[in-house]
Amino acid sequence: MQVLVRDNNVDQALRALKKKMQREGIFREMKMRGYYEKPSEKRAREKAEAIRRTRKLARKRAQREGIVSNGRTASVR
C-alpha cells in the first residue's frame, strides 16, 4: 500500500494510510490472524456474519420502503 507524503506532512500521510488500511480491512484481518482459528470455528463465524449482514440488509430495505420504523421513538408532549 502506498501513500504520498506532500510538503513533508507525515501526520496527514499517516492518517491517509490508516484510512486506506481500515477500508481494506487490514486491521480486522490482523486481529483475526492473531491466534489460530479452527476451521469449524471459522465456518461458524463466517456463517454468523453472513446472517448478520443479511438481516441488516433486510432491515435497511424495510426502512427504505417504509414498512418498519427506523427504531427511534418520537417524544410526545
Swiss-Prot record:
GO terms for biological process: translation. Residues 38-77 are annotated as: Disordered. GO terms for molecular function: structural constituent of ribosome. It holds the Pfam family Ribosomal_S21. HAMAP family: Ribosomal_bS21. Belongs to the bacterial ribosomal protein bS21 family. This is Small ribosomal subunit protein bS21. The lineage of its organism: Bacteria, Pseudomonadati, Pseudomonadota, Alphaproteobacteria, Hyphomicrobiales. The gene is rpsU.
